[in-house]
Amino acid sequence: MTPYFMEYYGNPSGHYEYGETSKKAIEQVRRTIADSLGAQPEEIYFTAGGTESDNWALHGMADFHPGGHIITTQIEHHAILHTCEYLEKKGMRVTYLPVDEKGMISLDQLEDAICEETCMISVMFANNEIGTIQPIDDIGKIATKYNICFHTDAVQAYMHLRINVHDMAISMLSASAHKFGGPKGVGFLYIRKDQPIRAFMHGGSQERHMRSGTENVPGIAGMGKAVELGMKHGKEEAAYVKKLRNDT
C-alpha cells in the first residue's frame, strides 16, 4: 500500500503518468478478485466495505423493483436487517426466514416464501456470530428456478471458503477486505453482468458510472495483496483453523 500513499499518489481517472499507474493497479486487483470468484473483471465493483456493498445490493434492487418482495433471514448482519427494515418503510415487503438451533434456514420454507413479487433473496454465506454456513448452492438453484436475484453477504466467507459465483448461481456478493487480512474501509460488490440494478452513487464515471467517486487506491492495492496471499495460502489457513476448532 505504501507506494500508493507516497509515490503514486495519482487519481486513477487522471490522464497523466501517476494517474495511469494508479489505474493499472486497481484494474489488476479487479482481475485478481474476479479470478478468485470465477467471475469477470467488469463484474467487480469497489466499495468502502461490506456494509456499503450490502446497502447497494438491497437499495439497488428495491429501486429497480419498487413495492417488490425480498426474502432474507432473521440472523443476517445488521447491514442487511436494518436496511430491510428501512426498505419496508419505503413500501417493500420483506420475509425474514427463521432458522433452526444450528442457525440453518429451511430450503422448503425459502421456496414457500417465494411469490410473484419476489425480486431478491439475500442470505448470508457464513454467519458472523455463530459461524453457520448456509446451503448456498441449493439456494442458488432455487433462485435460478424462479429467476430471482440471489445476493449473499460473504464478508465472513470470502477467502476462507471456496466460492465460485457461476457454479453457485450467485447474482451479487458482498465482501470486506479487513475480514481476510486486508485494510479497513475497502471492499467490493460482485454484480453478475446480466443482473439489472440501479447505480449506488452518482457523479463521475468511476466504477462504470455505478459507484462514483475517486477510488481508494491504497486500500484497493492492499485488498488485492490480501487476495493474492489468500489464494496462495488459503488451504493451509483453513486446515489450521479447522484444527483449532476440533482441538477445543
Predicted regions and their residues:
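Pyridoxal 5′-phosphate
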Residues: 1-248
